[in-house]
Amino acid sequence: ETDIEIMMSVDLGIDLGTASVLVYVKGKGVVLKEPSVVAFDRDTNVIKAIGEEARLMLGRTPGNIIAVRPLRQGVISDYTVTEKMIKYFVQKALGKRTFKKPRISICVPSGVTEVEKKAVEEATFAAGAREVHLIEEPVAAAIGAGIDISKPCGNMIVDIGGGTSDIAVISLGGTVVNTSLKIAGDDFDEAIVRYMRKKHNLLIGERTAEDIKIKIGTTYPLIEDETLEVRGRNLVTGLPKTVTETSTCLLYTSDA
């Protein structure tokens, strides 16, 4: 590589999450945030949509179109699809500018194995990166929150993602102790799906469950209860059904 090619390159930061992908361009900030979802034709294996467009297909696609999330619990479950998804998001973030291959820093959960780290690194190189640097999610979260991680004092970081929850104590620029739990946002969504089925005989999809969580989900009782109309399919009659749910009731979804 020549010095000119390197100067024409660009630095990217990617938060490769189970639920969503964020892309940061140095000097510009976060330029992209989209769901980690890919839709493809079951018969031809051709990708039909990636990101937000694919998310809208979750649970609502015709029989031959499948919408999948290529990462599960923070790690790659489908290497080829993940590679194509990263490449798509990188190209979308950079647009039609004539940058050479970018240098990419990409987040990984703190508890992943060396093999899982290698898979992320290789997928990012295959997607067109010139250099790849892996950074543990709690460290990235601390820096993003404005914490000076170089100081000789401990800061506990709790990063709840879609597939994993990372907890770490950071001091003097490094991780003192950390753990990664495979319980996170996706599990909350699944608990809401079970709860709606058990309480209302109502079948809802992942997308609806996530909307419920975002709009009225809470971990403690609110002074004023919030309500939301939820649409789904009646499991008894098979017909569309609408129910009204409250934020207080959702406190007990984990019991469903």
Each model region followed by its residue ranges:
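Nucleotide/phosphate-binding catalytic cleft detector across ATP-hydrolyzing
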Residues: E1-I160, A168-S254
